[in-house]
């Protein structure tokens, strides 16, 4: 059982966390600005709600209070405009040990759509490959970094994979490898070892 909530003030966040604890749910996802939960359309996503870093810091403090009072803190997932491996690392560290996952929406939809468009362009639809893509190559193997990896894994079946899925795979692999590098550099050999000791603020604000 999971609940997803948006970039709301501390009172509402406290209610969501406490009620999730009381109901013994499996996961509470907290989507900070500029995330999309309850904040669409675009203008609201970019300008309304509590920014993710503040919202997620509040979530940590509220979970700490729950635990000190003998209550169970629910497992958390953080979301809110994340798009790269350093975002994932910092979110997990900021919410440790309560944050167990990081959610992404638009960051993964975009490569999926680019891959889907590339599939049409490679069939010479919509004017063919634009220069922004053709500078990387003119075939699937040249355009998609991990196409050969998928070919080695799936053999001839790779030809049936939608290029939107291939684009998504490329970005997820990039995030995975980047996160592994950050974890190795910080001496965290498992995701569960990432802690708040691994991050610090560069300014008092």
Where are these regions (language model features)?
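Glycine-rich phosphate/ribose-binding loops and adjacent secondary-structure elements
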Residues: 1-145
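C-terminal extensions of enzymes
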Residues: 110, 134-205
């Amino acid at each position: 059982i999971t609940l997803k909530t948006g970039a709301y003030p501390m009172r509402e966040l406290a209610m969501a966390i406490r009620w999730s604890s009381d109901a013994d749910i499996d996961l509470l996802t907290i989507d900070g600005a500029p995330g999309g939960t309850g904040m669409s359309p675009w203008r609201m996503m970019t300008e309304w709600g509590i920014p993710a870093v503040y919202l997620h810091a509040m979530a940590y403090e509220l979970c700490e209070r729950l635990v000190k009072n003998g209550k169970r803190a629910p497992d958390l997932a953080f979301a809110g405009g994340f798009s790269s491996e350093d975002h994932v690392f910092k979110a997990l560290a900021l919410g440790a040990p309560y944050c167990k996952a990081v959610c992404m929406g638009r960051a993964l939809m975009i490569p999926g759509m680019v891959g889907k468009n590339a599939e049409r362009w490679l069939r010479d639809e919509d004017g063919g490959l634009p220069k922004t893509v053709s500078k990387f190559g003119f075939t699937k193997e040249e355009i998609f970094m991990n196409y050969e990896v998928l070919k080695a894994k799936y053999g001839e079946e790779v030809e049936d994979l939608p290029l939107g899925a291939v684009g998504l795979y490329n970005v997820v692999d990039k995030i995975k490898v980047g996160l592994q590098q950050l974890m190795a550099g910080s001496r965290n050999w498992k995701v569960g070892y990432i802690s708040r000791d691994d991050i610090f603020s560069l300014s008092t604000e």
